[in-house]
């Protein structure tokens, strides 16, 4: 998600270990999700991340944009390795 070292919509700095996600700006009241935890599952792994950003996300065709710590925890070695995948998620 974003560029390493960049600030998210909530002011967090994106790093290799960032456990944040972005929600689409097309989501109604998307700002109300900032600070909420979201449980994300893929391939038998489950992680909890925090909504700290927003974006276009493929014109609204994607539900979440994962920061590096999240996709690494779900088993990917790089952003290019992760790409676009279907995950299960729920807001906590």
Predicted region positions:
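Secreted/periplasmic proteins
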Residues: 1-92
């Amino acid at each position: 998600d974003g560029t390493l070292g960049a600030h998210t919509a909530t002011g967090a700095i994106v790093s290799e270990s960032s456990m944040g996600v972005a929600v689409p700006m097309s989501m109604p009241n998307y700002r109300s999700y900032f600070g909420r935890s979201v449980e994300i599952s893929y391939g038998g792994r489950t992680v909890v991340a925090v909504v700290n950003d927003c974006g276009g996300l493929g014109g609204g065709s994607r539900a979440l944009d994962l920061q590096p710590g999240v996709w690494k925890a779900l088993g990917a070695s790089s952003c290019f390795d992760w790409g676009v995948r279907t995950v299960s998620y729920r807001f906590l």
